[in-house]
Amino acid sequence: MTTGMRRALLCVCLASGLAGCAIDPTRLPPGATRAEALQRLGQPTATYPLPGGGERLQYSRAPAGFEVNDVDLDASGRVTVVRQVLDERWFPVDIQSDVWREADVLRNYGRPFEVTRVSSFDGVVWSWRYKLMNTPRFLYIYIDPQGVVRRWHTGDDLTTRYWW
């Protein structure tokens, strides 16, 4: 590879990296307007009303990705909080077993990576992929036939591990 080709490749890589940073939702400053959020981040994958007249813009990289970013706006349309919600620190704080319903799960985490059934539970298990220090993991939320969250847990994604 010639020096010119290496420089061109380096420029493309740097430009791609900077473009990726420009659309990182966590870089959106508090107080930004809804219009600014949409201009910087594009159309959200979902929107949800919040108490008090606010709105949640949800940017999910699922099913292939590992992040779901929630951008919360107040009633005046200004950003109050931006949070990457697929984070083990937040699961025990956010998930409310025996209280949350499907709509609460969707409003917080978006559409799941996968919906399955297991013989030990009468209902469905929704799962999301995320990373813990670059280790692929799953969040599993168990929803009963009435649409109520009954329990949740995390687990390693063993399909991506390499055992030598």
Residue ranges and their predicted role:
Residues 1-10:
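Bacterial N-terminal signal peptides that target proteins for export
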Residues 26-78, 97-164:
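A cross-family detector of function-defining hotspots
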Residues 83-84, 154:
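Beta-turn initiation residues at beta-strand->coil junctions
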